[in-house]
Amino acid sequence: MFLVDWFYNMFLWLGFFKKEAKIVIIGLGNAGKTTLLHLLVTGSLKSHIPTLRPNAESFTYGNVNFKAYDLGGQQNLRFLWKQYVPDSKTIIVFMVDSSDYNSIIESKSEIHDILGDEHLSQSPLLILGSKCDAKGHHNRENLIDLLDIRRFELGLNNSNNVPFDLIMTSSITRYGITDMLNWLDKCTDIIKNN
């Protein structure tokens, strides 16, 4: 078995075939979900109107092909979130506008609903503190406290065996984007091995 894994990893490293992963990007309206996905797909920024229907795009990072679903954050569209997470191999990316206190408090409720849901809590969850370049944004430690997630073990390899973390990002300055992509890449390896 060791030899088979070694050859498989060698072929991956050489780029003969790529891993596949599915991510669902959710969060309240105006958190930057569509802007982030556009940046990941095209490498450029563009202004967007609120997302009214699911938007599917693909992008590649390293040797992983990601199929990403950007779902609207308006209250009347949130019922879709659960429908796009069919199994524990789907990575949930929850974006929180770190510069908007009211949005953070409302996001806290949605995040705790995910963490308390028997089905969704089995999927890896990456919270992105977006707009960390904006004046008055909350830093990572502050955001962890405001979202009341300190009691949960953060990290890729936590004792729950379900990757869960918070990374600060800015689509405008690209701060944290590489950290996010590296986390997603490593997460696909963990999912594959579970």
From Swiss-Prot:
A Pfam family assignment: Arf
Annotated localization: Endoplasmic reticulum membrane; Golgi apparatus, Golgi stack membrane; Cytoplasm, Cytosol
Chief location of this protein within or outside the cell: endoplasmic reticulum
Binding site for Mg(2+): 70
The UniProt record lists the keyword Protein biosynthesis: no
Binding-site list for GTP: 30, 32-35, 131, 133, 172
Reaction catalysis annotation: GTP + H2O = GDP + phosphate + H(+)
Region (Mediates recruitment to ER membranes): 10-14
Motif (STAR): 2-4
Gene Ontology MF term list: GTP binding; GTPase activity; metal ion binding
Enzyme Commission number: 3.6.5.2
Bilayer topology annotation: Peripheral membrane protein
A GO CC term attached to the entry: cytosol
SUPFAM superfamilies for this protein: P-loop containing nucleoside triphosphate hydrolases (SSF52540)
Stated family: Belongs to the small GTPase superfamily. SAR1 family.
Protein function: Small GTPase that cycles between an active GTP-bound and an inactive GDP-bound state and mainly functions in vesicle-mediated endoplasmic reticulum (ER) to Golgi transport. The active GTP-bound form inserts into the endoplasmic reticulum membrane where it recruits the remainder of the coat protein complex II/COPII. The coat protein complex II assembling and polymerizing on endoplasmic reticulum membrane is responsible for both the sorting of cargos and the deformation and budding of membranes into vesicles destined to the Golgi.
Protein name: Small COPII coat GTPase SAR1B
